[in-house]
Curated annotation (Swiss-Prot):
InterPro entries: Restrct_endonuc-II-like, tRNA_endonuc-like_dom_sf, UPF0102_YraN-like. Belongs to the UPF0102 family. GO terms for molecular function: nucleic acid binding. It comes from the Bacteria. This is UPF0102 protein Oant_0187. Signal peptide: none annotated. HAMAP family: UPF0102. It holds the Pfam family UPF0102.
Amino acid sequence: MTDLREKKRTAFFRGHSAERFASVLLLLKGFRIVARRYRTRLGEIDLIARRGNLILIVEVKARSSLEAAHLAVTPQAMRRIEAAADLWLQRQPDHARLSLRFDLIAVLPRRWPKHVPAFFTSGNY
């Protein structure tokens, strides 16, 4: 196996592990996980969680520091996440009652994940 293929494979499994860890954090906070790795033609959402009428659109980043996790979410990624969230929301029968929030969960080495509520807002990148 080539080095590049091995790096991609490692990153893939690290990402899955980080998303599972982030899911546990959200469950402990009283959220229900509605979708994992929600894919559309416009983009992908790592996690969608719900508590009441609040919907969290969550980007999960496994990085060495909180700053590195912040920097890993580019304005282009934010636009794709928002576009995917809009498509998901349109498909919900109770979409008029729902409030969306775009959060970041940074999974850091040997620490509990850091939840950053309202990491970005719609249209503000």
